[in-house]
């Protein structure tokens, strides 16, 4: 049986999987990149994937009115949690996951480096 792909969810064009993509390529591990910021929908069924990696972006987790795809991304991540699909959140992706899990996320007093 073929291995299910790892899914990367891109929230902005310039935030891609970079070295993670190279890691997977070198090991012949299948992966898929979804440009959800460009209105590419999130998948319906998270069980199609071996793991999900929501990536970064400059937006805030609560800016769903300005970035409607965030709402769909949160719903999809909640389904991943329900189905025990491994999730690795990067930057904004970790904040989205934290929100889905019920944690409080807020703006830090200091900028990131």
Residue ranges of model-derived segments:
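Short alpha-helical
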Residues: 14-15, 95, 113
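Residue-level "edge-of-site" marker
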Residues: 37, 93, 111
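Ubiquitous "structural anchor" signal
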Residues: 64-65, 97, 101
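Gly/Ala-rich beta-loop-alpha elbow adjacent to hydrolase catalytic centers
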Residues: 89, 93, 98
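A conserved active-site-flanking secondary-structure segment within enzyme catalytic domains
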Residues: 99-113
């Amino acid at each position: 049986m073929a291995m299910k792909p790892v899914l990367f969810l891109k929230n902005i064009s310039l935030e891609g999987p970079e070295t993670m993509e190279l890691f997977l390529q070198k090991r012949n591990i299948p992966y898929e990149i979804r440009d959800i910021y460009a209105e590419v929908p999130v998948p319906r069924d998270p069980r199609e994937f071996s793991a999900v990696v929501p990536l970064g972006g400059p937006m805030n987790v609560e800016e769903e009115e300005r970035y409607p795809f965030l709402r769909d991304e949160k719903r999809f991540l909640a389904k991943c949690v329900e189905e025990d699909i491994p999730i690795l959140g990067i930057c904004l992706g970790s904040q989205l996951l934290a929100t889905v899990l019920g944690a409080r996320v807020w703006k830090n007093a200091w900028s990131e480096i």
